[in-house]
Regions:
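Cytosolic, long alpha-helical scaffolding segments
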Residues: 1-205
Length: 205
């Protein structure tokens, strides 16, 4: 289960990486590939859910084994939602064809996307090899993502004030940073599931 989960995580990580790149380079073809890639992520989710339910039904796991299955089920759901948000960013990339862009905002979105990708990557490593202390430490990366969200929102608002023609573009920027911020939230959720796996306690980090 853990290995399949990690493989699904790598697929989602690729989606996040490619969707941010597509958005800031205005690459609609790459955005379409991200959307197509979502079918693979959904396939992973279905396989992992099926395997988990089979283990519960056939083996009737207790204690640590049951926690393993429950952790996978919850974390898989978080990964799948990350993939959905990557698709939403790709759809925004396609929708923005011909719209006026704001380079300063896109540069910050690029940085935010890079740090979101790093957060997800670190979370996946934590899932395979982590500890409770490490989970608490990794979860703090979400604060940086939240700061990006606030700063880019303020920057975009200021730029639109100076150039009202960019208001449609601004709406898409707000959506994209919102999707990235939510991906960060789901990464933090996985940190919480690591704590549950190790201790049996449900916590909010």
């Amino acid at each position: 289960l853990h290995n399949q989960f990690y493989a699904m995580g790598q697929e989602v990580l690729s989606q996040i990486n490619r969707t941010v790149r597509a958005f800031v380079t205005h690459d609609r073809d790459l955005a379409k590939e991200v959307i197509e890639q979502d079918a693979e992520v959904n396939e992973y989710e279905l396989k992992l859910e099926k395997k988990s339910f089979e283990i519960i039904a056939l083996q009737q796991p207790v204690s640590q084994d049951l926690r393993t299955v429950l952790t996978v089920l919850k974390a898989v759901s978080d990964l799948e939602r990350m993939g959905d948000h990557a698709v939403s960013i790709a759809e925004a990339t396609i929708r923005m064809k011909g719209e006026q862009r704001i380079p300063a905002v896109e540069e910050e979105i690029k940085k935010m996307g890079r740090d979101v990708k790093d957060f997800v990557e670190t979370t996946l490593e934590l899932y395979l090899n982590g500890s409770v202390d490490k989970a608490y430490e990794v979860a703090t990366m979400d604060e940086k993502i939240n700061h990006y969200f606030e700063n880019i929102r303020d920057l975009a608002t200021e730029e639109i004030r100076k150039n009202p023609d960019a208001i449609v573009t601004g709406r898409d920027y707000f959506q994209v940073i919102s999707y990235l911020e939510r991906i960060g939230d789901y990464a933090k959720n996985i940190c919480e599931w690591v704590v549950y796996f190790e201790t049996g306690k449900i916590v909010e980090l």
